[in-house]
Amino acid sequence: MEEAESQAVEKSEGYPLVLTVVVPARNEEDSIGACLESLVRQSEAGWELGREWEIVVVNDDSTDRTREIAAGFAGVTVLDAGEPEPGWTGKANAIQTGVRAARGRWLLFTDADTVHEPGHLSLAITEAERHEVGMLSYSPRQVVTGLVQRALMPLIFSELAVLYSPAKVNNPEHRMAAANGQFLLVRRDAYEKVGGHAAVMDAVLEDVALARIFKRRKLGLRFRYAPEAVSTRMYRSVGAMWQGWRKNLALLFGNPLTLAVWRVLDLVLLVGLPFAAWWVWEVARYGKGAYWTHYYGLVVLLIWVRTLWRFYRRVGRSHFPWGDVLLAPLGLPLFAALLYQSWFDHTVKKQVVWKGREYSGMKR
């Protein structure tokens, strides 16, 4: 980090530190160690942990070794959130607990499954100040393992990239707002002006809900893909991935059933068109008018190639490696099923489950 960049991040009157990093954590023993190690490594001359900035981990009633692991890091403050009050989600309650103890002019809310590259905390503040925004959110590089995750996750993130494109989100005149709670940096005065997480206490997607308030209040919002700054492994099992997206998809996409139908149509075309071309060629071999019928099969094949190209062009926007993108057709039936289940939970059952807690009648 250059000296000029360090000097650009200054303390402000009223808060003794530049930044407080708040890490809400519930049963994150598999990931919180790597997260905190990457955060502690940010400390360097001119940007020293405990002098310019701090880390606050909020243990959200974990039943594993999350608290013990966090407490083992020197310079890290560990708090206990306790059970949330009625009407509060666990994550919003944990973040609010951390904010009450925070001493920074800027607040970074980041998940316990993230890994941060050296030097990028102060650079993020510099970026937010340069763009004069009250909220800066990064979409991390996603780390996935196993066939199911590799086939499904690019589909989800490509849809998110199309719907919540940074060009729309970063345009103050456009109504679209988005943020990613895995890395959400806010200027404290702007955050307090909107009421903090108390304003989104019952929102299942509190990050997007908070971004919408910031944009509506014209406090400045910037959102972008930032693989150079942060990465995350969101899910360590297929079950956890299924439960997580089941909670979120119906909230992220306005018409999940319509989207499910379109993805099923993708599957039908990708699989069906080659068989249709083969069938036409078989008819051409044995039927009358074989010479002309042969070209009909070629037309069908060209339509399939065009469909395949458009499909991969769309999924390529997910920022996943092409090895994962190529597997995306295998994930289409799973994506459609997940969209349906998420719609059913939110619309019919009106209840979602996450990290052992049930939420009913919560805001979108």
Model-derived segments and spans:
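Cell-envelope/extracellular polymer assembly enzymes that use nucleotide-activated donors
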Residues: 17-20, 54
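Acidic helix N-cap motif at the loop->helix transition within catalytic regions
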Residues: 30-34, 63-72, 119
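Short, acidic, metal-binding catalytic loop of nucleotide-sugar glycosyltransferases
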Residues: 37-52
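A conserved acidic beta->alpha catalytic loop
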Residues: 38, 59-68, 83
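Acidic donor-binding/catalytic loop of UDP-sugar-dependent glycosyltransferases
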Residues: 65, 112-127
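Long helical/loop segments within the catalytic core of UDP-sugar-dependent glycosyltransferases
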Residues: 80-100, 123-193, 198, 249, ...
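Catalytic donor/gating beta->alpha subdomain of glycosyltransferases that bind UDP-sugars
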Residues: 128, 135-161, 189-192, 197-259, ...
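Membrane-embedded multi-pass helical conduit in multi-pass membrane proteins
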Residues: 263-349
